[in-house]
Amino acid sequence: MEGTPPGAAPSSALAAVLKHSSALPPESAQVQGYDFNRGVDYHALLDAYRTTGFQATNFGRAVQQVNAMIEKKLEPLAVDEDHHADLTQSRRPLTGCTIFLGYTSNLISSGIRETIRYLVQHNMVDVLVTTAGGVEEDLIKCLAPTYLGEFSLRGKELRESGINRIGNLLVPNDNYCKFEDWLMPILDQMVLEQNTEGVKWTPSKMISRLGKEINNPDSVYYWAHKNHIPVLSPALTDGSLGDMIFFHSYKNPGLVLDIVEDLRLINTQAIFAKRSGMIILGGGVVKHHIANANLMRNGADYAVYINTAQEFDGSDSGARPDEAVSWGKIRMDAQPVKVYADASLVFPLLVAETFAQKADAFRAEKNED
């Protein structure tokens, strides 16, 4: 190459390969994974995720974000801060951070149900949002079990056998027959109370009633009823519950569910929150319903998304938290986190590093109430 001395590498190649770096910000963390020479310490292992990189680092940041929600939630309020007439509908006292938990139905079908039940049982979250399946699958599990299967099982053969597949989970169709037998008398009673007592049913009131009627401590909604945690399900008819309501409408017509009252309930929970945090597992209606409620307060203070959806198709499910910032659904000064992962892998670990670490503090708070 012209101008290059004999025996020397081309200067342009040297300049390109050996380009000098600018200094990184002094607070930059070094990549460091867990050293198993320390033995098996799961808390230390998960703490090391913060500096591992990729989605492990996002998980570590999600732990920090949820712990920030909990820290603010457990802070005592001033005497004049917890009186808002609009919040009396849910019968829940205001805390330093109102935590919204959203999850799709498949997670209740899976063993994540037990993780969610733990949070609700111990009054660790304030508002639940799910789909019809996220309600009915919890109740059905109190009547009959769901089984492990394989993703590869053929739909035609399963249908001929009366077996429904949810990923690698199997639900015998007899479970839904048992659900119908249990639900129909409750729907009859709801219609009676509507007609004779003027009860105005909403999806959240119906779910609370079902939680009371199931009377089983394995149920998420048993504990939601006991702890006055509202459960919002704007798509409550989109599932087996809807099927049963449809069949019941022929036998005993007239049941009315008011979604507008529930809309006011969730929006006021956000509006009057001192701070708000969103933990959203999956996407679709549960993700947007919580985010849109937080628009009413110019955005959530904290947000954690866990899902595998991508943003390239413009879907709400795949949208990153920064898109919600543009809509005013997450605050501009927030530090939201999205973990690109299957929630069945990640969420129990997240709870282990956050809520479960503060179990005694939550019990103490409940005893004070």
Swiss-Prot record:
It is an enzyme of class 2 (transferase). The keyword Ribonucleoprotein does not apply. Its cofactor is NAD(+). The keyword Ribonucleoprotein does not apply. Its EC number is 2.5.1.46. GO terms for biological process: glucose homeostasis; positive regulation of T cell proliferation; spermidine catabolic process. GO terms for molecular function: deoxyhypusine synthase activity; identical protein binding. GO terms for cellular component: cytosol. Pfam families: DS (PF01916). Keywords: Hypusine biosynthesis, NAD, Transferase. PANTHER family: DEOXYHYPUSINE SYNTHASE. Gene3D superfamilies: Deoxyhypusine synthase. Spermidine binds at residues 136-137, 243, 288, 314-316, 323-329. It catalyses: [eIF5A protein]-L-lysine + spermidine = [eIF5A protein]-deoxyhypusine + propane-1,3-diamine. The active site is at 329 (nucleophile). Catalyzes the NAD-dependent oxidative cleavage of spermidine and the subsequent transfer of the butylamine moiety of spermidine to the epsilon-amino group of a critical lysine residue of the eIF-5A precursor protein to form the intermediate deoxyhypusine residue. This is the first step of the post-translational modification of that lysine into an unusual amino acid residue named hypusine. Hypusination is unique to mature eIF-5A factor and is essential for its function. Coiled coil: none annotated. Belongs to the deoxyhypusine synthase family. Pathway: Protein modification; eIF5A hypusination. NAD(+) binds at residues 105-109, 131-133, 137, 238, 283, 308-309, 342-343. This is Deoxyhypusine synthase. The gene is Dhps.
